[in-house]
Regions:
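Substrate/ligand-engaging "lid" and interaction regions
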Residues: 1-42, 46-535
């Protein structure tokens, strides 16, 4: 069996092995999309293949749309060359269910793939043609948060960006420069309206995309390389929109155990490819069943009816509330708590931690008892139901190969948002008492204990990458098991608003955090004993 147009001609063979196949006339959809494209997506990675492409397939299967998806890749051209095109833009989605079963779907809603290469006249010419079409309603992105950045870590312009500012929209080299150039083509073709929709997992993502595109428009206009009207076009809400969105679906990299399932089905050409840019790609993608995509309903040229596929459309304030609900209460804090204590207790799978009665009780109390009373309720999603799904379906899913070590990455950058906002909400509330927070301070103390890089058995372990390690690790470097006179040593961290979002002394949580920390460093086995004592 081969994943291609030819290989899928024998539908019965695929269906006999349990595959759900496209139920629409793909040739007709391909032709309609080529003539009148509606939606192009930048970023041909796993989240797109597992989520947006499958949503579109379900809508096409029901005959509720006539056009499919076009995908463009601008970071790693080999994804298109080595994965999309050899398989005629088909891919296999393996949905990993919490009960241990899998669902296998051949996704065929992507009917054209493009390479975002301004040096390649054929590829770039086709993208310009797409951007000139009146029918185009939505340009979406999953290019990661750093994909929108025009500067390096020191705040200096990236060389490709600086060169593009000077050279203009003709043949840009940077990713956002190319996107801005394509938007300029649309501007030149009658100032046609369009929605530019970031679907990356970062707060206020539409603003990040706008800031990047707007900067290019301004620089080109300043340098006489584009009309001033192009800046006005980018700023005109009736012509170009940059909606906010919130996305949530875990799509780990293609897993060997999933590959084995598909190999048993005798599908050829499944081997993953590591590209020269170190992207790990395969003809299949594995993902959890749960998915959420909430988009601000701001589409100057109309939009596809993606609500028919489960995507939610609402106003900006509600998108913001959904984001805060997820990041500050209902998912991310629970993940971080499990990550910190999982590393200390020697776990290598997040799902295994949910079989640990004490760790489970800890995150249940952080979510339901401490977080929910001050949660931001967005209205379109129920926060309690969201936590229920996180704790009973998503995190315990044994098929999701997620690790506490991965989630512990950059914890110093996460504590202020994931826990500090809840602390601030308690402090601001007239009827909530900060003294009711018992387990959030335990996570704070747990992170300080984690920084010692010694697990609960007294064995050294490697800390996950974090930009502040060089600053924070020396604070705990002199602390040993059994020390009790530690408060003054850790005070610089407890007062650090950048880390915790508040000064823990001013918030009234420092005393409890210090007490917990002393108990956590009492000796080998103290981490387990402390969790047991307080949950």
């Amino acid at each position: 069996m081969e994943l291609s147009t030819l290989g899928l001609k024998d539908r019965a063979q695929w269906e006999a092995k349990g595959y759900q196949l496209p139920q629409f006339d793909r040739a007709a959809v391909t032709e309609a999309t080529r003539e009148n494209p509606c939606w192009i997506h930048f970023g041909a990675g796993n989240i797109f293949r597992a989520f947006q492409a499958n949503v579109m397939q379900n809508i096409l299967n029901r005959g509720e749309m006539e056009t499919g998806l076009i995908v463009a890749e601008g970071f790693d051209y080999e994804i298109i060359e080595k994965m999309n095109r050899p398989h005629d833009d088909y891919s296999i989605l393996v949905t990993l269910k919490a009960d241990g079963s899998v669902e296998k779907t051949v996704v065929g809603s992507v009917v054209e793939s493009c390479i975002l290469d301004s040096e390649n006249e054929g590829e770039y010419g086709r993208l310009k043609e797409i951007f000139c079409k009146q029918s185009l309603q939505m340009v979406s992105f999953t290019i990661t948060e750093k994909g929108y950045s025009l500067v390096n870590g020191k705040g200096e312009l990236l060389p490709a960006v600086a060169a593009d500012f000077a050279a203009g929209p003709e043949k840009p080299a940077s990713y956002i420069g190319k996107v801005a150039s394509l938007l300029y083509t649309r501007f030149k073709n009658g100032q046609l309206p369009i929605a530019m929709v970031s679907m990356d997992n970062c707060s206020h993502n539409g603003d990040k995309l706008y800031a990047a595109i707007h900067t290019f428009a301004e620089k080109w206009a300043e340098n006489g390389l584009a009309e001033k009207e192009f800046v006005s076009y980018v700023n005109d809400r009736e012509k170009v929109s940059f909606p906010w969105s919130m996305i949530d679906k875990i799509t780990p990299r293609p897993d060997a155990s999933v590959e084995e399932i598909l190999k048993k089905d005798e599908i050829d050409g499944l081997d993953p490819v590591v590209t020269s840019k170190n992207t790990y790609v395969a003809p299949f993608v594995n993902a959890e069943e749960c998915e959420y995509l909430v988009i601000e309903d701001w589409f100057p040229n109309g939009r596809p009816e993606l609500e028919k596929g489960g995507i939610m459309f609402t106003d900006r304030a509600t998108v913001d509330k959904v984001e805060k609900m997820k990041v500050c209460t209902c998912l991310n804090p629970l993940h971080t708590a499990l990550a910190v204590f999982g590393c200390l207790l020697g776990y290598t799978k997040i799902s295994d931690e949910m079989k640990d009665a004490e760790l489970r009780k800890m995150v249940e109390r952080i979510g339901y008892t401490e977080g929910l009373p001050v949660v931001v309720d967005p209205g379109i999603l129920d926060p309690k139901e969201f936590i229920d799904t996180v704790l009973n379906v998503r995190i315990p899913n044994p098929f999701m190969p997620d690790t506490p070590q991965r989630i512990a990455t950059d914890t110093s950058q996460k504590l202020a948002i994931r826990f500090g906002e809840t602390v601030k909400n308690y402090l601001a509330s007239k009827d909530k008492d900060i003294k009711n927070l018992k387990l959030i301070p335990l996570v704070f103390a747990g992170w300080l204990r984690y920084l010692m890089a010694v697990d609960d058995n007294g064995e050294k372990f490697e800390l996950s990458p974090d930009p502040l390690l060089e600053t924070v690790c020396p604070v705990v470097a002199g602390i040993k098991f059994g020390d009790t006179d530690v408060e003054e040593m850790i005070r610089p961290l407890l007062t650090n608003r950048a880390i915790f979002g508040v000064d823990l002394y001013e918030a009234g949580l420092a005393g409890l955090t210090v007490q917990y920390f002393k108990e956590l460093i009492a000796g080998a086995g103290a981490v387990r004993a402390t969790i047991k004592k307080y949950v």
